[in-house]
Amino acid sequence: TFYQPSTNATAGSNHMSYYSRTTGGAAESMIDMGSQGTSFRENQIIIRFSNNVYLESNSVAGGYITAANTNAQGYYIATRTSNTAIGGQKNTTQYTGTATESLSNYVTYLGARNRSGTAEYFSNRECAFATIGTGLSAAQMLTLNIIVERYNDALGRGVQ
């Protein structure tokens, strides 16, 4: 993507999103989008691992939101709106949490995680849409979900 959080992100304001058309198995080790830099600075979306979703936006290792997720199809957003506040969303279900901010110094990969310059945990899920940008409020995440779902429905590939 050429998006490097330590260079391109604004402190306390970042988001990533990923629209998955396929689900995959619960035990598959795949990371759908992300980067991990030195000192475990992480920015990643892990849609389904052990039937959970992990959403992490510019956090130190373990600074993620996790929730049960048995179907990987849908639209996922990981966001940071301050140095400590993180949020996330699957379709219209929202999650909140806190995590210390730490910007990854490696570019973000789509379809895998960039770990200190090496791609790993490749995903075989079909990506129908992805974004990277400034942090999103709860209302903005819901609006973005509506826009992206309508777009994918118009193309005959919506899954919500």
Task: Give names to the regions the model predicted.
Residues 1-160:
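Polar, enzyme-active/binding microenvironments
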